UniProtKB/Swiss-Prot annotation:
Its EC number is 4.1.99.17. Belongs to the ThiC family. The keyword Metal-binding applies. The gene is thiC. It comes from Salmonella dublin (strain CT_02021853). InterPro entries: ThiC, ThiC-associated_dom, ThiC/Bza_core_dom, ThiC/BzaA/B. The keyword DNA-binding does not apply. This is Phosphomethylpyrimidine synthase.
Amino acid sequence: MSTTTLTRREQRAKAQHFIDTLEGTAFPNSKRIYVTGSQHDIRVPMREIQLSPTLIGGSKDNPQFEENEAVPVYDTSGPYGDPEVAINVQQGLAKLRQPWIDARNDSEELDDRSSAYTRERLADDGLDDLRFTGLLTPKRAKAGKRVTQLHYARQGIVTPEMEFIAIRENMGRERIRSEVLRHQHPGMNFGARLPENITPEFVRDEVAAGRAIIPANINHPESEPMIIGRNFLVKVNANIGNSAVTSSIEEEVEKLVWSTRWGADTVMDLSTGRYIHETREWILRNSPVPIGTVPIYQALEKVNGIAEDLTWEAFRDTLLEQAEQGVDYFTIHAGVLLRYVPMTAKRLTGIVSRGGSIMAKWCLSHHKENFLFEHFREICEICAAYDVSLSLGDGLRPGSIQDANDEAQFSELHTLGELTKIAWEYDVQVMIEGPGHVPMHMIQRNMTEELESCHEAPFYTLGPLTTDIAPGYDHFTSGIGAAMIGWFGCAMLCYVTPKEHLGLPNKEDVKQGLITYKIAAHAADLAKGHPGAQIRDNAMSKARFEFRWEDQFNLALDPFTARAYHDETLPQESGKVAHFCSMCGPKFCSMKISQGVRDYAAAQAIEVGMADMSENFRAKGGEIYLKREEA
């Protein structure tokens, strides 16, 4: 771990340099490929890892090789992963989905911003130096129209977004021919439907049933379509955002790009500090992945941080502000009801959700029902006009394993199920947020309860952390729970970084959290038996057995760390072709010994086979030519 501490000025300057010099970058020995759909502008990005050939025989002067197929993998990095694309953060990303949105002809540009706060910010010329220059003119649904992917799915329409997703979820596995790579253990899927080939119609069907969501605000055309549902690959969310204490716009944009590079399928901007509006605009215009927020955080800032002063009007204005910027999903803590708050009194750690505690305090101060619950239908009307998905927040999630699976937690969950049905009346897409802190033996019940109470809407959990004793290592404690609940059917895992419970994560913390959670998500896909999930593992194992070190590095989730660890003890180029590593050395390498055993067994089999043929030759009289039997 680095011991160098940068000043705030140095951190900001470093982030600014990152942004100014940003260009598309591929991982080592990887290249960006695009798979085209039924129309020319459906170009689905993937990363293809190129592999070296296997030595199969021959001589030193004339070696014989067998080619190894390139391995295609899911890629969340957008244009930042393509060296051929010119990157300019000041201009933002290309508007990939704009032609599809326009072609549907069910939305219209607004003459002015609907949010009074947005109009106030735009009128403040003191913010000109902070403001993103290429602001979009926001759109909303035409009168009487709904523009959500759920609405289209229910109408039987397969959108370009759905076709894009079908291609993306298949991960190019149809390109793989090797039986060794295609081999896969049967999984235990706990009732999930995992077709061998995902079609656009299957995507449409899952969205129509509410089992999956496509977060895709019509005001975020830069995003590449993705899907969240238990019958698809398990996804990972990364949280970024400034606070009143630290971080800047430059640093948050840097963290966004960094997150997508290391595999974030979505990113939540949880900013609570200065310039929340401006920071979010920069993030959205440069994000190839869906962006989520917790609007109550900004609404609280608008009333000077005093929860009791929150009003529906201030919150509604915040929803309009963020929807017209392009936020793809809102976390709404509408299930924290007044009657549930006393249930938390006997907890060890009370209410640990920021949004949950804000709403609980408001309810108790006014002795009124949660205004988010009371105005939930109006929230749905706003979301339906922009296609903002709802992530129904678990404001009463347990903050310690002692509080896991208690009355407050599951009471709120049942209310979220009721709210899910209301949202579906408005064709609004919904996912459900989950815990939290839960010991391993109590995790599966969370998934079972969610499926039953929330009608199979996608589950999105923070971990859960399986023990409370490891501050500084909570990416590990939660990664265990994340792998388990992903296996049981959780659709998206919210990452936890090493800084959880300790401080705001920096760039390296973001990477550590993402790598941990990509491992958890992939382990869950393997356990479920998701078709094609084992291809990369098989390729890695084959490279490992054949001592193809470069391929091992390049197939790793983090090639740079894998290479660095190897090179700590064997830095020479000869170490990249050696048939051992520093763990066992040349004499005790189990794989080298296994290769010898295999070669010996093969030679023995040939020798036994030759002996059998010799015996058979003698038994038939030892004649070189046998007489043909007469008919």
